[in-house]
Each structure stands twice: as structure tokens, then as C-alpha cells.
Design a protein with these regions (language model features):
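RecA-like P-loop NTPase motor core of helicase/translocase proteins
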Residues: 1-194
Length: 194
């Protein structure tokens, strides 16, 4: 599959960002070990990555453990190959930052049409986009939709792409739309046993 010139430029920028992120995170992880526990939270490798890459940074992303993580947004025009760029971004992330073939990607889409088209494409093992994902995962790609069972084992052993429609997680659409947050027992493996 051939990328257009602007897509090559976008992926090139993304690769540079992932490489710089990995380098900065590794050096901060080393420095963090030398600090007392109460000071470790002050090291923000994400902010430093953006500063050294001369990219504007305003976000302060932390996970549930208070650890920093990078988040990026790509604006691509209609017909600009958003799905292809997303697949390439996942591949480069796996190779340059995560340095592993497994993990979880939450793929959020804006409409039912795009949702069904993208899920259909990426479930088809003959589709070039799916083949690119399979290359990145060592042929261990799982395409899941909201409501399907997901375990820690799935994420440890596969590259899991979890599709969600933005409307299904929006408070503006009422209680019925928020069923994504309802306990179904499908995520039990993510919590320690009592």
C-alpha cells in the first residue's frame, strides 16, 4: 500500500515523535529511580518530549496511577486516508515507542457508517489495512467492539483494537447510551481478586 506525499510526511513526524518520546521516557525512568518516592511525580517526560521536539504542549495526560502518557491528535481532511494513517500510526507506535507487538488501542469513530465500514475492513484478513496490523502484531490482531468480552490475557497476547462510537460514551445521549459503563462482568480479569 503506497502512502501519498503528505501521508509520508505525517508518518515521518509521528515516527520522530515516538522515537523522541521513547528516548526521553527511558532517561526519565533512569532518573526517577534515583529520586525519593515523594519527588518522582515531578518528572514529566511527556512535557519534556514536546519541548525538545519544539511542539506546542498544553495537555497534562495521566493514567489512573498518575503516570504521564503522550496523546496526539491528527487532523486529516475528508478523503485524506484517516484509516490508513491510523493503522500506520499504530504500527509505528508498536515499533518505536511500545517496542512490543501487543496492547490495546481504543479506536473512536464519529458515526455508525464509519464504524461499520472500518470494523468490516479491519476484520477482513485479505484487506491491506488488516494485513498491516497483522504485520505489526505478528499476526495476532483482535478486532473487538463495545460490549465484547476483553481480558488482560487478550491484551498481553494480542494487539487488540477496540472500536467505540463516540455517541455510545457521551452523557448527552442519555442513560441508554451510557450502557458501555454498565458492569457486565466482562472486565473481571483487570481487577485483583479479593
Amino acid at each position: 500500500m503506497f502512502l501519498k506525499k503528505y501521508q509520508v510526511k505525517v508518518i515521518s513526524e509521528l515516527k520522530a515523535f515516538y522515537g523522541k518520546s521513547r528516548e526521553t521516557k527511558d532517561s526519565f525512568d533512569t532518573a526517577r529511580k534515583a529520586l525519593p518516592a515523594e519527588m518522582r511525580h515531578t518528572l514529566n517526560w511527556v512535557q519534556t518530549t514536546f519541548q525538545t521536539a519544539a511542539k506546542e504542549y498544553k495537555d497534562r495526560c495521566t493514567n489512573g496511577l498518575g503516570e504521564y502518557y503522550p496523546r496526539i491528535i491528527m487532523k486529516v481532511p475528508t478523503g485524506g486516508g484517516k484509516t490508513l494513517l491510523a493503522v500506520e500510526a499504530i504500527r509505528e507506535y508498536q515499533n518505536l515507542f511500545a517496542r512490543k507487538r501487543t496492547g490495546l488501542v481504543v479506536w473512536i469513530v464519529p458515526s455508525e457508517t464509519i464504524y461499520s465500514q472500518t470494523v468490516r475492513k479491519l476484520r477482513d484478513k485479505a484487506n491491506p489495512l488488516r494485513q498491516l496490523l497483522d504485520q505489526a502484531s505478528g499476526n495476532k490482531t483482535l478486532i473487538l467492539e463495545k460490549g465484547q468480552r476483553l481480558t488482560t490475557h487478550d491484551i498481553e497476547e494480542n494487539l487488540v483494537i477496540l472500536f467505540v462510537m463516540i455517541q455510545s460514551i457521551s452523557r448527552q445521549n442519555g442513560k441508554e447510551a451510557l450502557k458501555v459503563f454498565q458492569d457486565s462482568g466482562g472486565f473481571v480479569s483487570f481487577f485483583p481478586s479479593d
